A protein has these predicted regions:
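Gly/Pro-rich hinge or "lid" segments in bacterial periplasmic/extracellular proteins
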Residues: 42, 48, 92-102, 149, ...
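Extracellular/periplasmic solute-recognition and catalytic clefts
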Residues: 168-170, 226-237, 262-326, 333-337, ...
Length: 604
């Protein structure tokens, strides 16, 4: 009976699609080619290719990418080890794939249809009959259920959090699998399940899954791992039998026959390798280098070009993170005092050629940001149970990060800092800031791993010393930095949280109370706030874009009020340099540049 019902549903979905009614609005019955978090997908069931990809892109050649850091595992799905880049996507696929011109819409990949109810308390995926792993074995519902169970029990903390919300998963037909989400009250969860990596049940030993390994995972994606030099490089080659090459979502993508990622432990070595042509495309993050260092012969000769790509995503939160698990940073007044000692104007002018903009929100650069916007009635309603969670100037939209005179010796910020320190029980004795009751000096360590981080930290430390703070910079290699970060073993460090136009479950992983004690989560600050948890819940249960924006802005206000980071800065555009042998489409996605849509010029 279940199989017959499923077939009837699929027939209904096909009829709706054919009539033009199959595109999802708030909700429509039946199976669909896509699912949007809010509203309906931009591309109908008959779409031919993504708007940002060129379906005529030539196939062939090799792309070499340079990565700063190292790796000691090819398994990106567990907390152990430093995984190599791009295993997910290149080798391992999910049920659905993102459309990168929309905030959060997923289109068919391993699954060719998705069906959910109005409450999104269940979701059913029907697998594409052509879907195969690289060894030729069919992808079936048992692989999907196996992946869910394995990642729920042994995966990274975010997987465990998300997939634990699923009550049950079961095969309902030869190609269909249904997830029961009853009680989750999480409208994003069907999409999160749609992005779940699907692993080959017959090729994985669950007892060894959490071990670091250089043995490639078997996947269903467009590439397979062809060579590994531990810590130095990973090579991928095209799977000539890739089952999904004709899918609409893939048209114009995956154009290289081979892709290699070379790893560099040092930023200068990384840049010099690009100048020599040892890798093809570089994302620049240093405005000083972008402004002055691209003067080498290949650029003058036109063999290298610099390009600036606009992107419509929130700019994320790049900040110096207070580990509030440390007693020294438990008092919010202390954190705010230190925020007042960061001289962005001096640093931006002297280090960054005034190219950066100051971060003033966890969702800067889009309508989700609360910066400069008074809270509306819906936000105030959400925040009413937490009257002390948001400070008045953040509630009315007048707050902005402290602005200095740019001299490097700003007295206004120093006075504000001393007033806050005094309120928190600290006083200046001679040239040292000490706790008045215990006499304990105010001292902490700032952990860094790159030269850029170290340079910023040293500049900040100079200003902290003016306030009598004994701040020390400790530089460690990438492996030690990652391990200490995972274990929350730091006082302060720099970190960047990326954001999307449809933030959701990952916010619990970033700021949720449960994540504060879960090693491997990204709640590096140790936020434990009922207000934060409630705003995340409101985001996840929002049924309209208006309610979603209100909940996200309310979350932004609570996080800003907590002074959990010293907000840093962001570039207004993506700075990309490439050797001209690599070409790209004329249209840029909402997410900016996408290397999977680029191609090698010699392949024409």
């Amino acid at each position: 009976m279940q199989w017959q019902a499923s077939r009837r549903t699929l027939m209904l979905g096909a009829l709706l699609a054919a009539s033009g009614l199959g595109r999802i609005s708030a909700w429509a019955a039946g199976a669909h080619h896509a699912i949007a978090m809010h509203g309906e997908p931009d591309w109908g069931a008959g779409f031919s290719h993504p708007s940002y990809a060129d379906p005529a892109a030539p196939k062939g050649g090799q792309l070499v990418q340079g990565v700063l850091g190292t790796f000691d595992s090819l398994n990106p799905f567990t907390v152990k080890g430093l995984p190599a880049a791009n295993i997910r996507g290149y080798v391992i696929e999910s049920l659905l794939a993102r459309g990168y011109d929309e905030p959060f819409t997923l289109y068919g990949l391993l699954a060719d249809s998705v069906e959910t109810d109005a409450a999104r308390s269940t979701v059913t995926f029907t697998l594409n009959p052509a879907a195969r792993f690289a060894d030729g074995k069919k992808v079936d519902p048992d692989d999907v259920i196996f992946s869910w169970q394995l990642l729920r029990d042994k995966g990274r903390p975010n997987f465990r959090i998300y997939y634990a919300k699923v009550v049950k998963a079961e095969a309902t037909a030869e190609r269909s699998v249904r997830f029961d989400l009853a009680g989750a009250d999480d409208r994003e969860l069907p999409l999160i399940i749609g992005l779940m990596p699907v692993l080959a049940r017959h090729a994985i030993d669950p007892d060894k899954f959490e071990d670091t390994t250089f043995e490639p995972l078997l996947g269903s994606g467009p590439y397979v791992v062809s060579a590994v030099k531990p810590g130095k490089s990973v090579s991928f080659k095209r799977d000539p039998n890739y089952w999904g090459r004709e899918l609409p979502i893939n048209h114009g993508s995956w154009n290289f026959d081979a892709i290699r990622f070379d790893y560099y432990r040092d930023g200068n070595t990384h840049f010099e390798a690009f100048k020599k042509g040892l890798y093809d495309v570089r994302t620049e993050t240093d405005p000083g280098r972008w402004q002055t260092a691209y003067d080498f012969p290949a650029l003058a000769q036109g063999r290298v070009v610099k390009e600036e790509f606009p992107y419509g995503l929130p700019k994320g939160m790049d900040g110096l993170v207070f580990n509030t698990r440390r007693p020294i940073f438990a008092d919010m007044r202390v954190r705010e005092a230190i925020l007042n000692l960061f001289d962005f104007e001096w640093i931006n002018h002297n280090y960054f050629f005034d190219l950066y903009k100051r971060t003033a929100s966890y969702f800067d650069g889009c309508d989700l940001s609360a910066h400069g916007v008074p809270a509306n009635a819906r936000e105030r309603e959400l925040l009413a149970p937490f009257p002390d969670a948001v400070r008045a100037d953040i509630m009315d939209g007048s707050w902005t990060p402290p602005v200095s005179d740019g001299s490097g010796r700003d007295r206004t910020g120093l006075r504000r800092a001393f007033a806050l320190f005094a309120a928190a029980g600290y006083e200046l004795k001679g040239t040292r800031l000490v706790h008045a009751a215990s006499g304990r000096p105010f001292a902490f360590e700032l952990l860094t791993t790159t030269r850029d981080q170290e340079r910023l930290a040293l500049a900040f430390v100079r200003n902290l010393k003016r306030a009598g703070i004994d701040a020390r910079v400790r530089s460690v290699d990438a492996t030690q930095f990652e391990r200490r970060r995972i274990m929350f073993d730091f006082d302060m460090m720099q970190y960047r949280w990326e954001q999307s136009l449809s933030p959701g479950n990952e916010q619990s992983f970033y700021w949720g109370s449960d994540a504060a004690t879960q090693e491997g989560s990204r709640n590096y600050m140790g936020v434990k706030s009922k207000a934060v948890d409630a705003m995340i819940a409101a985001m996840l249960s929002a049924t309209s874009r208006e309610d979603f924006v209100a909940a996200t802005r309310a979350l932004d206000r609570v996080l800003l009020s907590g002074c959990y980071v010293v907000p840093l800065y962001f570039p207004p555009k993506q700075w990309i340099a490439r050797w001209t042998r690599i070409e790209h489409p004329s249209q840029t996605s909402l997410f900016g540049y996408l290397p999977e849509t680029w191609w090698h010029g010699d392949a024409k």
